[in-house]
Amino acid sequence: MPFSPLGKGFLTGTIDDKTTFEPTDFRNVVPRFTEENRKANVAFVEWLKTFAARKNATPAQIARAWLLAQKPWIVPIPGTTKRHRLDENLGAANIQLTAADLREIDRAASQIEVHGARYPEALLKMVDR
């Protein structure tokens, strides 16, 4: 079961280097979400937006469709409190990514270096335990 299949919201395409989070938002302590790192990491999201537009989908739908295409036993479980996000989440199941699409996504992702650790140092020590 993928944890945070939208990269804590980053793959929705709505977060960039100008985004501010509420003071209590966990992303404030995540190195990957510093302004500098968001600025560097937005390159993949911009590519994802373009790819999604070609598929008449949102970046979030493509991210979920990609996960669904990986293995039949991989099931992203999205969380939402908004009706329109629920509809968007369900729409990902209707997107068929071809083998060529998957190669294109993988190629784009491999060409972009992700900046910043996924968790603060103290939490990284607990990953994969």
Segments from the language model and where they lie:
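Hydrophobic faces of well-ordered beta-strands that scaffold small-molecule active sites
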Residues: 1-2, 76-79
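Aromatic-lined glycan-binding groove of carbohydrate-active enzymes
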Residues: 1-23, 58
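Short glycine- and Lys/Arg-enriched binding-loop motifs that mark or flank ligand-binding interfaces
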Residues: 5, 9, 75, 112
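Short, flexible segments with low predicted structural confidence
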Residues: 19, 34-35, 57-58, 76-77
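Terminal-tail/helix-coil boundary detector
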Residues: 23-54, 69-73, 87-129
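Glycine/threonine-rich phosphate-binding loop and adjacent beta-strand/alpha-helix elements that clamp
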Residues: 62
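Flexible loop/turn connectors
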Residues: 81-84
